UniProtKB/Swiss-Prot annotation:
Keyword flag Transport: no
Gene Ontology biological process terms in this record: tetrahydrofolate interconversion
Organism: Lactobacillus delbrueckii subsp. bulgaricus (strain ATCC BAA-365 / Lb-18)
Keyword Zinc listed: no
Keyword terms of this UniProt record: ATP-binding, Ligase, Nucleotide-binding, One-carbon metabolism
Family statement drawn from the similarity comment of this UniProt entry: Belongs to the formate--tetrahydrofolate ligase family.
UniProt-recorded Gene Ontology molecular function terms: ATP binding; formate-tetrahydrofolate ligase activity
Name of the featured protein: Formate--tetrahydrofolate ligase
Gene3D superfamilies assigned: Domain 2, N(10)-formyltetrahydrofolate synthetase, Formyltetrahydrofolate synthetase, domain 3, P-loop containing nucleotide triphosphate hydrolases
Length: 559
């Protein structure tokens, strides 16, 4: 019987976290342990690492458009990282985002890799971990409570209850909280107003946590968060209300990177978790920079496909790092590409070369998108048991015909041994890397130009269309002097368009911009397209129905 991911993880022989840290030159005095197998790295160690003058090679991992068939991007990131570390003997760190409990209990289930390429302790990482998500949720909701109390207690600045833009947050998928009314009943219950909840990982405070370099930076960014507008339509920021210190205090521990290990004991930083469809989609700047200072190779996974997390990493996140990536990996699977053509999971286990050829257009778009930044690219095929030799040969030849190196990876079943060839190739590319990055837009471009450049170059749209609401918001942002900020486009992860049903590699379409939201503390503008939601709902059969715990406390069902 094939073991499940959680069974494999629970059978693993973990090293004490102090032994894992020692591989990076960290001592027990550099750690704040959370039990035996996980720890936060303290500020003393972070500051010391910043002064060591060393920067390792940076490898970005992205993928094709996600499908119900699965791509295994985390599995590939971990498997290749393990192979560089253990098969090639080169000091390596893996940098991943923390899973959100919403999708863990919703559609996705666990998110810590798979098979014999996982980060552990898997149950902790997927559930409460070191408490970062709880700290963020507390900070988000305390901020909202303080704002509502400010209005109730006199509202000296004249903050308009109808123009509050910050939302409350929960790390739970709950569609009933997308639109609510608070303060109902008597005045004793506060000022009645419409409100909304969003998933914790999509909130601006999550973005701020992942972009802050230290506590001072964290506090300054929180102070810049836009709360809402006055009755005279003047902006009000957190610093105007004096709440930044309290909120920063709630997040001061969460800001420190979390250290864990893979099944093969490769050090891994799992820290921060902004979604790539509604936020910037990459792990924290602090953990990536720390990894670069402490190792020779760092693999960082960007959320969803190259059009979302990949694009946001290359156009925005990498400008905040101490270096640009040296190479990139694009992950693909045979069955996911067949899904791009068939739009159904019914027959994906059956050989179908015609569907694979048709679906290849999606991978072709993604790998060329990444190459358009001038970055060296390796395409890896995550092999599944149902893949036939004919399908694998066809896909590999299609990739290589486009001038991309390609390796087939079996890390899910074989661990690092199944990723050795890919590890050798990506190390070769990273070591030889010497290029000038060509980003999608210039930082000096205005918002409309940035949006148009991403839409046309990365999505291959023909045009961009704005609602009247979005046009008004553009005018307001320009009036506020915020029209030159980077853009984070909120878009469905399933398509290059804003329509979830348009699979493959569509062209000639119009991208529909519904609204623009200032994330002043994070330093970008979120551009909402299509029907993207920042508070997901649960599916008819949520993953929660498969999760259980026995009388000994052993958890099952997290894949």
């Amino acid at each position: 019987m094939v073991k499940s991911d959680i069974e494999i993880a629970q059978a693993a022989e973990e090293l004490p976290i102090t032994d894992v840290a020692a591989k990076l030159g960290l001592t027990s005095q550099d750690l704040e342990p959370y039990g035996y197998d996980k720890a936060k790295v303290n500020w003393q160690a972070i500051k010391r690492s910043e002064e060591n003058g060393h920067l390792g090679k940076m490898i970005l991992v992205t993928s094709i458009s996600p499908t119900p068939a699965g791509e295994g991007k985390s599995t590939m990131t971990i498997g290749i990282g393990d192979a560089i570390n253990n098969q090639l003997g080169k000091k390596t760190v893996i940098a991943l985002r923390e899973p959100s409990m919403g999708p863990v209990f919703g559609m996705k289930g666990g998110a810590a890799g798979g098979g014999y390429a996982q980060v552990i302790p898997m149950e902790d990482i997927n559930l409460h971990f070191t408490g970062d998500m709880h700290a963020l949720t507390s900070a988000i909701d305390n901020l909202s409570a303080l704002v509502d109390n400010y209005i109730y207690q006199g509202n000296e600045l004249g903050l308009d209850p109808e123009k509050i833009v910050i939302k409350r947050g929960l790390d739970v998928n709950d569609r009933t909280l997308r639109k609510v009314t608070i303060g109902q009943g008597s005045k004793f219950n506060g000022v009645e107003r419409p409100a909304s909840f969003q998933l914790t990982v999509g909130h601006e405070l999550m973005a701020i946590l992942c972009l802050s370099k230290d506590i001072a930076d964290l506090k300054e960014r929180i102070g810049k968060v836009l709360v809402g507008y006055t009755y005279e339509d003047e902006p009000v920021f957190v610093k105007d209300l004096g709440f930044q210190g309290a909120i920063a205090a709630l997040l001061s521990t969460a800001l420190k990177p979390n250290l864990v290990q893979t099944l093969e004991h490769t050090p891994a930083f799992v820290h921060g978790g902004p979604f790539a469809n509604i936020a910037h989609g990459n792990n924290s700047i602090l953990s990536t920079n720390l990894a670069l200072h402490l190792s020779d190779y760092v693999l960082s996974e960007a959320g969803f496909g190259s059009d979302l997390g990949g694009q946001k990493f290359l156009d925005f996140v990498s400008t905040k790092l101490e270096k640009k990536p040296d190479a990139a990996v694009v992950v693909a699977t045979v069955r996911a590409l067949k899904y791009q053509a068939e739009k159904s999971t019914d027959h994906l286990k059956e050989e179908n070369l015609d569907s694979l050829k048709e679906g290849f257009a999606n991978l072709d778009r993604h790998m060329n998108n990444v190459r358009s930044y001038n970055i060296p690219v390796l395409v890896v095929i995550n092999k599944f048991p149902t893949d036939t030799e004919a399908e694998l040969d066809l896909l590999k030849s299609l990739i290589e015909e486009q001038g991309f190196p390609c390796e087939i990876v079996t890390a899910h079943d074989e661990g690092s041994k199944g990723a050795k060839a890919a590890a050798e190739k990506i190390v070769e590319l990273a070591d030889k890397s010497d290029y000038e990055i060509k980003r999608s837009y210039d930082l000096d471009d205005d918002l409309e130009t940035k949006i148009e450049k991403v839409a046309k170059r990365i999505y291959h749209a023909a045009d961009v269309e704005y609602t009247d609401k979005a046009k008004d918001q553009l005018v307001k942002l320009k009036k506020m002097g915020k029209d030159k900020l980077p853009v984070i486009i909120a878009k469905t992860q399933y398509s290059f368009t804003d329509n979830v049903k348009e699979l493959g590699a569509p062209t000639g379409f119009t991208l529909h911009v519904k609204g623009l939201s200032l994330r002043n503390g994070a330093g970008f503008v979120v551009v909402s397209t299509g029907h993207i939601l920042d508070m997901p709902g649960l599916p008819k059969h949520p993953a929660a129905l498969d999760i259980d715990v026995d009388e000994t406390g052993k958890i099952s069902g997290l894949f």
